[in-house]
Amino acid sequence: MAAGVLTPTLTNNLFARPQGANDRINVALIGCRGMGWSDLSDALVRPEVRCVALCDIDRHVLEDRAAELERRTGIKPTLYADYRKVLERKDIDAVIIGTPDHWHCLMMVDSCAAGKDVYVEKPLANSIAECDAMVAFAEHYKRVVQVGQQQRSGLIWHEMKKYLDSGSLGRIAKVNVWANFSYASILNPVQDSTPPEGVDFNMWLGPAPWKPYNS
């Protein structure tokens, strides 16, 4: 997929022109927790990027994020519970998809079909078939799409790849990998319960098979 238009690692050449109203990049964030919010914060480092819409299935998250965004940028975004309403807006140039994985494919292809460029969080999708469809939509609609895969966009990683490919290190016989955190805590079972007020759990499930809510 083509390089994205949003992340701070993007070359400055793309924006090396006088800034006017038509030079603004209007962005919508779909999925306002965690990585989605982090991605938006990175995008807003660029003065030509402004967030005009937020979308989430949790009304409380929406309201909190909208208030924070207005404090930071002075712009009051329009709030949505259904991403399809976001894609109807002609003034939105690009979307950031920070939803759970099972939504990535449908939201990304719908965004491409609606004429939006896309930054979609990792993992790209849940199957090779979904990935194939996403690539096909990006190519058919000629959209700029980037996957939020860490250590892929920065120039330092491209230089490292070139260095490894050059053979300067010789034959690599062993690679050590480590992590400084553990996912063990998420293995603890949580009892099913009723979705809290303000959360549209059916919309959260979307294309996924039905299952009861738990926190």
Region locations from a protein language model:
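A contiguous active-site-proximal alpha/beta segment in oxidoreductase catalytic domains
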Residues: 117, 125-203
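Pol beta-like nucleotidyltransferase catalytic core
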Residues: 183-186, 210-215
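Glycine-rich, acidic and aromatic/proline-enriched surface loops and short helix-turn segments
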Residues: 85, 206-213
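Residues embedded in well-ordered beta-strands within globular domains across many folds
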Residues: 53-55, 96, 173-176, 205
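Alpha/beta-hydrolase-fold catalytic nucleophile elbow
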Residues: 30, 121, 178, 207
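N-terminal glycine-/serine-/threonine-rich beta1-alpha1-beta2 phosphate-ribose binding loop
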Residues: 1-120, 126-144
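Redox-cofactor-proximal catalytic regions of oxidoreductases
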Residues: 46, 81, 152-153, 211-213
